Amino acid sequence: MKKLVLAWVFACGVALAQPAEGTVFYEVFLRSFGDSDGDGVGDLRGTTERLDYLQDLGVGGVWLMPLHRSPSYHGYDVTDYRSVNPDYGTMADFEAFARAAHERGMDVVIDLVVNHTSSAHPWFRQAEAGNAPRRAFYSFSDTDPGWQGLGGPAWHPSGRGYYLGLFWSEMPDLNYRNPAVLREMQDVARFWLARGVDGFRVDAVQHILESEGGIIANTPENIAWVGDFERFIKSVKPDAYLVGETWTDTETIVRYHRAGLDYSFNYPLFTALVGSVQDRNPGELERVLEQDLALYPPNARQATFTSNHDQIRPGTSLGFLRRDEARLKLAAGLLLTLPGTPFLYYGEELGLPNGPGDADEEKRTPMMWDGSANFGFTTGTPWYAFSSDDSTLTVAAQAEDPDSVLNWYKTLIALRNEYPALREGGLELLPGTPDTVLGFRREHEGQRLIVLANFAGEVQVDTAAYAGATELLTGRAVGETLTLGEMGMGVLELKPE
């Protein structure tokens, strides 16, 4: 099955920004993470109070979903880019959070929604009222150009004309062909970098500059814009970085890296990893890894993930009829032993499921901390229902269970933090393993690891070539064969050459 032996080196000979290669990040939806004042809504102080938990988990960075003023619960329609949503606290609360994170060795990344504003933003209200400079901040047309947006028409009626809003009418697109808009957003980035932000996750990164003919994603001008914005933030703070929401194919993602983007979310790898675990077959994951090996440039940093605020949680997607901890652990094991910079989504380390409905809110339900009232999230009425009433899923319960999903994540993150080969090493896909097993080598500065991941029932793997190695998850010596349980993994440290 395995014909290719390829090497993947993520960074060689190129000066890249912090954080350290392979650091594990953790995505937080403030509204759902920790409530400090009992109003049922998570906030910055509540999240600051939980930083010790994240430090114990082993993460090195925190990504905060939008924290600015916004009329929506999710915050992706901003009304003031230089503010903190009052639901979440004050600017002083944010600065205290950033200091506390940095004291624990964690980077702080915030969402930067550059593509569009809220229709309630003062800029847009002034534009609709006829203010010429503000009207030039957006794209207006006397007639409807007839473009298709993301889920509906891209142009929306306004007075005697139309304005562009790719996502929907209440998210009008900014016009970056106007230099004043670019200067404004550069100043916003400068504002947050001065307040302790280390990097920005750029939302809707593919859609910032459309073509005049109606191409709404990944135009050459758009890709160049992203590279220029990366260079701008580095001119302000040399170790700052962008993480692009590159929800597209591998060939297109590579174009962003060649333009200068530091980090890209690897959506094809996400789809292949979760799909292969669902299918109990490593074939598609292996195919995508081979593609990545062939296409990514050496300066590319891939943000890898199995979950985020837009996706069905693995606690649901990997166990539609019942909780399937074996699948959850295999997906986590792959994420944390493959190359890249893993981004976890809050509650993923517990295997939390989606809520019962189809709304996006069901992917963003409150965190379950302990068995007390409202699972320790709030002393008030939670802003949204919990995704489960099972107290065994909480942090407190899983911390006491050595075989829990939480402790599996902690084990793998600790292993990743201890072994540079897992964070920085190249990737070599191994031939000759059973069809249900994906094998790969990670190597860095003489440290050599072999990872064997089994996607189906119990199987024996020929490990004669690695006899005398140590299996790091159990501490046992490796003999002529290694038995992998159903959905099981082995991480072998080879003796120094």
Model-derived regions, located:
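Solvent-exposed beta-hairpin/edge-strand motifs
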Residues: 465-475
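Loop/helix patches that line or flank the sugar-binding groove of alpha-linked glycan CAZymes
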Residues: 19-21, 233-236, 248, 255-258, ...
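Positively charged n-region of N-terminal signal peptides that target proteins for export
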Residues: 1-4
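C-terminal beta-strand-rich structural cap/linker in extracellular carbohydrate-active enzymes
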Residues: 480-497
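Core domains of carbohydrate- and sulfate-ester-processing enzymes
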Residues: 125-165, 272, 277-295, 364-388
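Acidic/aromatic-lined carbohydrate-recognition and catalytic surfaces
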Residues: 18-186, 190, 194, 205-258, ...
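Surface-exposed beta-strand/loop patches in extracellular or lumenal glycoproteins
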Residues: 455-467
